[in-house]
A protein has these predicted regions:
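S-adenosyl-L-methionine-dependent DNA methyltransferase catalytic core
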Residues: 1-55, 59-73, 199, 225-301
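Flexible, glycine-rich beta-alpha linker
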Residues: 187-188, 216-219
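Conserved Class I S-adenosyl-L-methionine
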Residues: 192-207
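Conserved beta-strand signature within the Rossmann-like core of class I S-adenosyl-L-methionine
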Residues: 174-178
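A cross-domain feature marking catalytic cores of carbohydrate-active enzymes
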Residues: 128, 180, 209-211, 247-250
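Core alpha/beta nucleotide-donor-binding catalytic domains of modification enzymes
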Residues: 24, 28-36, 40-172, 182-186, ...
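Short, solvent-exposed loop/turn segments at the edges of secondary structure
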Residues: 221-223
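Conserved S-adenosyl-L-methionine
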Residues: 99, 182, 205-216
């Protein structure tokens, strides 16, 4: 997060999440099961002449799915291992929100087989969990603060990039987009990065990596991320990266500018009833208007 201190300078802040009890969410009216995925794809094709089908791997609650939706993609399948993430995704998006373990070869093959029954897939996108490559995790390991079980989990996650590439190889979408931490392409981890590039090129993709600072595009976050795009040679033009909106971090959107319109809450807060309301006075700046424009917000929430 970006925060301006008392003298107007910007400081990075790391926030620890505080979780309350989970809430039950109803499924989206256009959601479908994994077995129903080919039928769902056929239904979309009957409505849209040339739909752009996308797949969101390691989807979480659906941040990337929302971006793809706004870019005119139909996200027919989203996969994640966390139940609460999939329940949230299923509430907000149509298509299949599939809870699964993408580290398993059987799961990879099942997903690829189902997608190949759906016709042409325009894009496979996602960010394989990056803890093994993270500087933060390496620092914690150095200080012996990570349990043996956590270390074992991280080593399993080290190979999730391969799950992503394996699905790309089997499904052969027109394009793919992988996001990860920058350390994956730096000293000590370059073997993984080279393997991703080599396998994608061997599968017939033109590769175009890009280091992106989200704050340059209006996101209140300082961490740089590595994006690797691949487009099918002779089928797609190379991906063109958007030009940055900001050149100086002093111009970037701050945390206050992002959420100052929201009512104050304590950690772990959950409403007791869905009809519980609290006062909302509306967005205070252009960024907040942009972030809230897809919500149906009454005078009271």
């Amino acid at each position: 997060m970006i925060h301006k201190n008392a003298v107007g300078k910007t400081d990075p802040h790391r926030l620890s999440p505080v979780r309350g009890p989970s809430s039950e969410l109803e499924a989206h009216k256009d959601s479908c099961s994994f077995d129903e995925l080919p039928e769902y794809a056929a239904k979309v094709r009957s409505i849209k002449k040339e739909p752009y089908f996308a797949v969101d791997l390691f989807s979480g609650a659906g941040g990337l799915s929302l971006g793809l939706h706004r870019a005119n993609f139909d996200v027919i399948l989203a996969c994640d291992i966390r139940n609460d993430s999939i329940m949230t995704h299923r509430h907000h998006f149509g298509g299949c929100s599939y809870e699964c373990d993408l580290s398993k070869r059987k799961v990879i093959n099942e997903i690829s087989e189902q997608l190949n029954k759906c016709g042409e897939i325009s894009l496979i996108a996602g960010g394989p969990p990056c803890q093994p490559f993270s500087r933060n995790i390496k620092w914690r390991k150095h200080n012996e603060e990570v349990s043996a079980q956590h270390q074992e989990l991280n080593e399993d996650r080290r190979e999730l990039w391969e799950s992503f590439i394996s699905i790309v190889e089997q499904v052969k979408p027109k394009a793919f987009l992988m996001e990860n931490v920058t350390d994956i392409a730096q000293t000590g981890e370059q073997e993984i990065y080279r393997s991703i590039i080599n396998r994608a090129e061997k599968a017939g993709y033109r590769i175009n990596p890009k280091l992106i600072y989200a704050w340059q595009y209006g996101v209140p976050q300082l961490r740089p991320r590595l994006f690797i795009s691949g487009t099918k040679i002779n089928e797609c033009a190379p991906m063109k990266w958007p030009k940055p909106k900001y050149d100086s971090v002093e111009e970037a959107v701050t945390l206050d500018e992002a959420i100052s319109d929201l009512p104050p809450l304590t950690g772990g807060w959950r409403c007791e009833k869905w009809d519980e309301k609290f006062s909302y006075e509306g967005p205070k700046n252009d960024y907040q208007k942009l972030m809230r424009d897809w919500l149906d917000i009454d005078d009271e929430m």
